[in-house]
Regions:
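Nucleotidyltransferase catalytic core that binds NTPs
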Residues: 1-192
């Protein structure tokens, strides 16, 4: 059981390309659910195999804007950005105190393909954010995951549909906090 008074670092990983209103709302909800925990955004670096990431410095700056709104318990970690070779979530989490990793149910779908699976599932705790069309319990009942079921906690949160890809496809500022939208305009980002 993930106790609310555990001293822990909650780590929210992702590309944050760009960070959206959904990322902010998820962070706020998780921080509210675990008021004694430190909260870290963990953006992936360029060594990660995701294409189309804007420069790390811009993603870090935009995440700092989210942290200003979230308050002093939140911070941005640049450990994966500093890594020249992506080593995976397993090794990143080892750098935090009693870590709990936040992931969307859409990312839970492929957890068996993560570097260092099953160790990452066996040795860590996770807060899973529901996503439309993803049956979290069915995933956690898979043979490869069911013995780690107690390490996964499903956060009761309303459906938030504001993905970074939706912003990149539409350039609609409704997906962003105003200060992030302003930063994007000032720095001429996501023009393609």
């Amino acid at each position: 059981m993930l106790e609310r008074d555990d001293i822990m670092d909650i780590v929210f990983g992702g590309s944050f390309n760009p960070p959206t209103v959904a990322h902010f709302r998820i962070a706020k909800k998780v921080m509210s659910a675990y008021p004694s925990a430190a909260f870290y955004f963990l953006p992936t670096g360029q060594a990660y195999w995701k294409e189309g990431l804007i420069e790390d410095r811009h993603r870090l700056s935009m995440l700092e804007l989210l942290c200003r709104r979230l308050g002093p318990r939140s911070a941005v970690s640049d450990i994966e950005i500093k890594d020249k070779k992506y080593a995976g979530t397993y090794y990143s989490l080892r750098k935090f105190n009693n870590p709990v990793f936040v992931l969307g149910a859409d990312n839970l779908v492929g957890i068996e393909t993560w570097i260092n699976f099953p160790a990452v599932a066996a040795e860590n705790r996770f807060v899973v954010i529901p996503r439309a069309g993803v049956d979290i319990e069915a995933i956690l009942a898979r043979d490869s995951l069911k013995k780690y079921r107690d390490n996964f906690f499903i956060l009761d949160v309303e459906e938030i549909s504001a993905s970074a890809s939706a912003y990149r496809n539409t350039k609609d500022d409704k997906y962003l906090l105003p200060e992030v939208a302003q930063y994007i305009k000032e720095n001429n980002l996501y023009k393609e």
